[in-house]
UniProtKB/Swiss-Prot annotation:
Gene3D superfamilies: YVTN repeat-like/Quinoprotein amine dehydrogenase. It comes from the Eukaryota. Belongs to the VID27 family. This is Protein CYPRO4. The gene is CYPRO4. GO terms for cellular component: cytoplasm; nucleus.
């Protein structure tokens, strides 16, 4: 919607523009459209009373963004971000320089596990390809670790022998010398009954762990590290698990604190050290952790919940949904910003608030009160949305990767079809940004870089921030994986020279 032009663009078997001659006609259309959208999503008339019922009285800024307090969006800005040389050109792509593109090994690529140290890993259903990390990206065909578990089954299959189900999650841990592989127990379902522990150095699956609570087998749909940087800890023995109605921490040591003797055990059991099994209806979908171990969880109903480091039982803050399921979440290292992915847009949430003593805190530490900033939406333009195709959906929205306190994330990236879409974080946070002028409703940002491949992209993610420090770029390289190729791009500062291989 372009208020200054009294124009509405939309997609329906093509891209169309609806132009209004009078300002009042345009505004009436926008108001009626938003009311109809609310009624279609929630099945309620778009009255103020029903909006408060849906969003809650503390989220009045989400209902009426024009009265929301936007000051928190620029609360933590500093001069580094305000420098014009650090700003991303609008919708430009000439400052993304392709460094390396390599074909995958036999078996292709199903997922990528980026390391912050020397290596990263390309995962498929038969093994893991080890590649080298450089300041200009990842490349080089190193050791290929073929899954070998000594005859044990792989990844939660209930039948004997190897599972033919591709690992849906690969999680690095213990100083990136080990990898946990989680595969669905049944085709078409995300739930797994356990994980396999791969020793990368020996190339062996050393243990198949079972998920169990109170003597009963249970499932998990996702796993992640305890904190943003805990995969670098060589002594790491715990990780987090998520299921539709469960949030938990798992420990690979026994209850007495001793490492389990797994040599004579067919199915060692992971210990549920803390967590909560919720009543049905939470429908958790994805989760992520901050630098201190606080947890953000996205749900099927669109809600995003924040849990502190001290309790997984009750969320400190629960942001309402906007009508679309959250399929993926990420959070900045400091916990100030949360990114949720839906099929058609990304939602960026500011978790900062001022408590009664005037101190600035995040929603992970306490109740945010009723002055909660309105979120911002990141969307494709109608033309790009049409080009992406009606069946292609956003997935895997992430911040650039920071694992140290005091560092700042600079970009956001998500994948849709053959597109990798990159937003400048500071531009999105800037309330005076040109995208937001004359907009009605929640602020939506359409300024991004668009990278295109010749096949659907599996994942788009930035390498660890330390690889920005050793190169010519202000940002670590972007890695894009398709089923057949892995490509690295450098974010040029105008001085770097690009290479094509």
């Amino acid at each position: 919607m372009f208020g200054d032009q009294r124009r509405v663009d939309f997609v329906d078997s093509g891209v169309w523009a609806l132009k209004f001659m009078r300002d009042e006609d345009y505004r009436e259309f926008v108001t009626r459209f938003q009311s109809c959208l609310f009624e279609n999503v929630y099945g309620l008339k778009a009255s103020d009373e029903n909006k408060v019922k849906v969003y809650g009285k503390d989220f009045i800024g989400w209902v009426k963004p024009d009265v929301a307090d936007d000051s928190m969006w620029e609360k933590d800005d500093d001069e580094l971000w305000r420098s014009p040389s650090k700003m991303t050109p609008v919708r430009g792509s000439n400052d993304l320089l392709e460094e390396f593109e390599e074909a995958a090994s036999d078996g292709g690529i199903q997922s990528v596990a980026l390391g912050a140290l020397d290596n990263s890993f390309l995962v498929n259903d038969s093994g893991v390809q080890v590649v080298k990390n450089f300041s200009h990206g990842i490349h080089g065909k190193g050791v290929y670790v073929k899954f070998d578990n000594g005859g044990k089954r792989v990844g939660g299959s209930s039948s004997g022998g190897y599972s033919n189900l591709t690992p849906q999650k690969a999680l690095l841990m213990r100083g990136e010398t080990n990898m946990l592989l989680m595969s669905p127990a049944k085709a078409g379902k995300p739930h797994s009954t356990g994980v396999n522990q791969l020793d990368i150095e020996t190339g062996k699956i050393v243990t198949e762990w079972k998920f169990e609570k109170d003597g009963t087998d249970i499932t998990m749909r996702d796993i992640t590290n305890d904190t943003k940087g805990s995969q670098l800890d060589p002594s790491e023995s715990t990780f987090l698990g998520l299921d539709d109605n469960r949030l938990s921490q798992w420990d690979m040591r026994d209850r007495r604190g001793m490492v389990q003797n797994i040599a004579h055990s067919d199915s060692p059991v992971l210990h549920w050290t803390q967590g909560h099994q919720f009543s049905r209806g939470t429908n958790f979908q994805s989760f992520a952790t901050t630098g201190d171990g606080s947890i953000v969880v996205g749900s099927l109903d669109g809600k995003i919940r924040l849990y502190s480091t001290t309790s997984m039982r009750m969320a400190k803050t629960a942001f309402p949904g906007l009508g679309s399921p959250i399929t993926h979440v990420d959070v900045t290292y400091d916990g100030k910003w949360i990114l949720g992915t839906t099929d058609t847009y990304l939602i960026l949430i500011c978790s900062l608030f001022t408590d009664k003593d005037g101190k600035t805190k995040t929603g992970f530490s306490g109740r945010m009160g009723n002055k909660i900033p309105a979120p911002r939406l990141l969307k494709l333009t109608p033309v790009d949305s049409h080009t992406a195709g009606v069946n292609n959906k956003f997935h895997g929205g992430r911040f650039s990767w920071v694992t140290e306190s005091g560092k700042q994330e600079r970009h956001l990236v998500a994948t849709v079809g053959k597109f990798s879409v990159i937003w400048d974080f500071q531009r999105v946070k800037n309330s005076g940004h040109e995208c937001y002028r004359n907009q009605e409703g929640l602020k939506s940002c359409y300024c991004y870089k668009l990278m295109t491949k010749d096949e659907s992209i599996i994942e788009s993610l930035f390498m660890n921030d330390k690889y920005a420090a050793v190169g010519d770029s202000p940002e670590a390289p972007l890695v894009m994986a398709t089923p057949k190729k892995i490509t690295s791009f450098s974010m040029s500062d105008g001085k770097a020279k690009g290479k094509r291989r």
